[in-house]
C-alpha cells in the first residue's frame, strides 16, 4: 500500500501520501532530487485550485528526506521549510 512507504517521511500522513501517489510517485526514493515547487504547482492543477502553502513545505521536507542520507533533525520538521 502506498501509504506505508510515504508515511515514513516526517509530516506525511495518509492525505499527503495520496497526494504524492496522485503526482505519480510510487516510493519515497522517487522523490529524490525532485522540485518541491513543481510538485506543488502540479498538484494545484490536479486538484483544480490553489492549495494550502503548508503542503509545499511538507514537499520540501519530503524531498530532503528522500535525497539525503544523513538528516539534520531540525530539517525533518516541515515548518522549518517555510519561505
Task: Identify the residue ranges that each predicted region occupies.
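C-terminal extensions
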Residues: 1-10, 14-83
Amino acid at each position: 500500500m502506498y501509504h506505508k512507504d510515504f508515511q515514513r517521511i516526517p509530516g506525511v500522513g495518509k492525505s499527503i501520501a495520496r497526494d504524492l501517489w496522485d503526482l505519480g510517485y510510487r516510493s519515497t526514493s522517487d522523490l529524490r532530487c525532485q522540485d518541491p515547487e513543481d510538485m506543488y504547482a502540479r498538484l494545484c492543477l490536479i486538484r483544480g485550485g490553489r492549495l494550502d502553502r503548508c503542503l509545499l513545505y511538507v514537499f520540501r521536507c519530503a524531498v530532503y528526506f528522500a535525497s539525503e542520507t544523513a538528516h539534520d533533525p531540525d530539517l525533518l520538521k516541515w515548518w522549518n521549510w517555510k519561505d
